[in-house]
Each structure stands twice: as C-alpha cells, then as structure tokens.
Amino acid sequence: MLVSETAHLDPETPNISRIYDYYLGGAFNLPADRERATVIKSVLPGMEMLARFNRGFLRRSVAFMVDQGITQFLDLGSGLPTAGNTHEVAQARDPHAKVVYVDYEPVAVALGEQILRGNPNAVMVEADARRPDELFGHPGVRGMLDLDRPLGVMMTGVMVFVGDHEDPVGLMKAYRDVCAPGSYIALSHLTDERADPETKVQVHAMVEAYKGVIEQLYVRDRAGVEALFDGMTLVEPGVTLMPEWNPRPGLDIPTGSPAHHLGYAAVGRVD
C-alpha cells in the first residue's frame, strides 16, 4: 500500500499494512489497527471480505504466472508479506522463484524484513511505487531480479491510491516499458460501479473512514481500469470482478458477499 510520507512507527497510530493484515486473519497487527478496522467495517460491513477477495485474486494470478513460466515477481505496494502472499504461492510451485516486495511505508518494510529473514529468494525493499525510475535502480531490486527476463508484476490494491492527477495510465506504461516481453502485470482496483445505492454510500463512507491512515482512496469504473492496460494484451476473462477472475480449486474464497461487486481485477501480458 502507498501511504503518506508522514507515516512512522508509532504503535498507537493505526497502520494501513497492519489493518490489511488484520482483515486477512494475520498476526501482525496491534490494538490501534484493530480499532480502526472495526470502525471501517462498521461503515462497510463487506470490507473484510473485500480484502479476502483481493488476496484471493493475488494468489490465483501468481499461480497463473508461474504456470506460464514466470520465475521472478515484483510485488508493489505489498504491505506485509503474510497470509498467503506472493512468495508463498510462487515458491510452493517453484522453490527457486524470486520475489521482491516493495512498500513505501516503514512499518511494512521493517516487519517484512523480519518475516522474510532466512528466505534467500525473497526480499523487502523500501521504495515508492509511484517512482518507478528510482524503484528499478534500488540495489535490492537490481540484486534479485533480472530485468532482461519476463517478470510478474503484482499491483493488487495499488492504483487505488493513485489519482487521475498523478497520471495512472502513464505510471502503468512506465512499468510496462521496463518489463521484458512475456511479462505479466496483475492489477485489482476498488469500484462502486456495480454496487446498489446503499452500498455506494457505504463505499464512500469507508473512503472517509480511512482518512488519517492513508492519503486518499480512488474509485474507478471498468473503463478506467481497462485504460490502465493500454498497450498490453488482457488475459481472459479480461477485466472482471475479483472473485470471478479464473477461480481455481484451493485458491478461491466463497462468494455471495455484497463485496463481490466492489473490486475489478485483470492480468495483462506485455508483448
């Protein structure tokens, strides 16, 4: 997740990465995080399930990429590498798969380094995903990834922090241009396009409830998400609701929640 430059290690201050960990049933969260998460869930009861849909999409898209021969991953705005994250899925299929987690937020980086200690093929890097030139020059990225080979780029829940004034299409192009042909980019995004009126009100109340923890959340429709994949070939079924993107036995989570309609997901191939 991308967060404000003022973020710090104060355990009394709710933290976006730890809140997300709490939604996923992880153990790396504190009372302040759980308290804010409870407030957020009170205005959007489907928030926890939405987080689980997002993680389910990440797991399925990583599995898909490994099946296509991808052996190295860049997970942007990753938060904490817990609860069935990229390295766990990739390395279960290919023990030699390499993963670089990137987050700007120092809490996520500090905890992530502890979690990944002892794993020679996974590292945590402190960098801002909105600055790809700096990110790709980071020694942690350069030391782990071979940018001349195809790469799996994970952008699950990242572009929701990038407003139109920050040129999200241009940002996606910057990543696409660095990726070797045969690379894949997975992206998920918050939406209220298919929500009923009551749920739309809840979504915008949730956006307000997150203020003070993050800078801003942005909601996009399907056309807005499709535009982010300009210049790439969308993998079937294209842009779809998160739980509907290529469900796989053992990697799915139940549907039926109002949150089913609150996130789009897609994977694009770099040709």
Would you name each region that the model predicts?
Residues 1-127, 131-145, 262:
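Rossmann-like AdoMet
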Residues 215-239:
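Short alpha-helix
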Residues 125, 151-155, 171-192:
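Conserved beta-strand signature within the Rossmann-like core of class I S-adenosyl-L-methionine
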Residues 238, 245-271:
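Core SAM-dependent methyltransferase catalytic element
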Residues 132-137, 161-174:
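A short, conserved alpha-helix within the catalytic core of class I
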Residues 145-159:
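Short SAM/SAH-binding signature in class I
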Residues 130, 159-161, 190-194:
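Short "lid" loop at the C-terminus of a central beta-strand within the Rossmann-like core
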Residues 199-221:
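Conserved Class I S-adenosyl-L-methionine
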